[in-house]
Amino acid sequence: MKRISIFLIGLTCLTGTAFAQEIKEDFVPSVMNQPGQEYPMVNSQRYARFRIHAPEAQSVIVSLGLGGQGGTVLTKDANGVWTGTTAGPMDEGFHYYRMTIDGAVVNDPGTKNYYGSVRWESGIEIPAHDQDFYAMKDVPHGQVSQILYPSKETGQTHRAFVYLPPQYDGKKKFPVLYLQHGWGEDETAWSNQGHANLIMDNLIAEGKCKPFIIVMAYGMTNEVKWGGLASFDFTKFERVLVDDLVPYIDSHFKTIAKKEMRAMAGLSMGGMETKHITLARPETFGYYGIFSGGLYSPEEIGDPSKVKLVFLSCGSKEYPDAILKATETLKAAGYNAVSYISEGTAHEFQAWRRSLKEMAPLLFR
């Protein structure tokens, strides 16, 4: 657990460069901007430019990433407009950010908000070379709907989101993937930041993936203080998920209610939750997936016949060697283990979008 905590400390999204380069002035509005808003902007080199009108302010800084890492200092013109460009190119994909104006942390009014860092953060999308797999296309689309389910464990009603594939008609039964968000996020993360529904729609339309249901629940991770991952007890969420949510889903949707047709996966802390729950309740899930959230060992899982698939992934800027080594160890012990390394990404959503894209076709074969 200590090793995993170290992996998760550096949740930065801005990629620094060791050399300066001339910035191309081909900036265009980010696709995540509010309607009619020009800024923030991105260019073909993956630089981001921010602007805000704050005539009375004395300083404006943009901090990027989960928890607000680093800082791009904006400069003020004669009209009270602050503008600044990142020092270097950013990694492809989605990034959280926030503005600090005279010490007050605020969101950028030019862009949409996304839940992360235990607050609503601003979001920016850096165009990716492979963004076609989560693009909005003219294909049959599934539905993402909100559900409210009672929990005996907490005595409260909880919210989750459910993706139903285009083929869901209330008659045929489908397998289910329980897909968890990371620290500081909530049940909206995988559909809003991760585009899980679009990834699935496109894979299904291309015949690369079997249709299945995805359940995205709040993982209680916001009860964890920054830096407290190693001491967090996943047992409470284990009981909410397995004893409350799974039976609710099986009774309210057309599911194939057996272990061989259930999977669990998660990103970052959601991966840590996945590991805990799949090992604690091996009778519930047949497919395991950890995205940037740790490793499995043969000693932890036990009998290889208990699990259909073990999927491990991370960004190439994280701990790829550990992922590859763990996967080879599992294979040698008789497990169906698959690894995936997202090239050019760190601990960020582009790595996890790609991980879902790679894992989904392997499920429920």
Predicted stretch roles:
Residues Q21-E25, S30, G36-Q37, V42-I61, ...:
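Non-catalytic cap/lid and distal C-terminal segments of serine-dependent acyl enzymes
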Residues S5-T15:
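Bacterial N-terminal signal peptides
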